[in-house]
């Protein structure tokens, strides 16, 4: 998707390309920020003629880790199957894969998430902090899982998108 957008946008205008994903999609967008230098498509005959690095990454209540202590079991099974190796577990545990040039991250989760353990986000935050990656981490006490961009669900998480918009402005991604 990043390649398609970058190769087909109006080059006379400045474009900012961010990626946002929720739950398992949060894992996917974090991978896009971490693995953008890897040309996984070349073996399929698809050649890259642009940067695959997103300008920013927004994982919301994300799956982060494939490690036994944190893994969302269904996500791990869907991604790795049932006969996975330790190397695969480590490769797809994003808290272990953050590069020094990771794009800025806006990370959101709630402690009462009944689907994805919030400690996934805590571990990602620790790694981003350790590597001095520009990021914001919103950790809410309540909000559950699946609140998306909704302001209708109420509670603390209802206004995360307003904080996100402010972050976009402060980081010069939008005016």
Where are these regions (language model features)?
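Short beta-strand/loop motif that positions the catalytic acidic residue
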Residues: 101, 106-109, 113
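Acidic catalytic loop of the alpha/beta-hydrolase fold
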Residues: 66, 112-116
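Hydrophobic anchor at the start of a short beta-strand
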Residues: 17, 105, 135
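Mobile cap/lid helix-loop segments that gate and shape the active-site cleft of serine hydrolases
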Residues: 62-97, 103
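Stable alpha-helical elements in mature extracytoplasmic
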Residues: 1, 24-28, 94, 120, ...
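A general structural signal for stabilizing positions within well-ordered secondary structure
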Residues: 48, 96-97, 129
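Primarily recognizes the serine-hydrolase "nucleophile elbow" in alpha/beta-hydrolase
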Residues: 1-71, 89
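C-terminal catalytic histidine-bearing segment of alpha/beta-hydrolase fold enzymes
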Residues: 108, 118-175
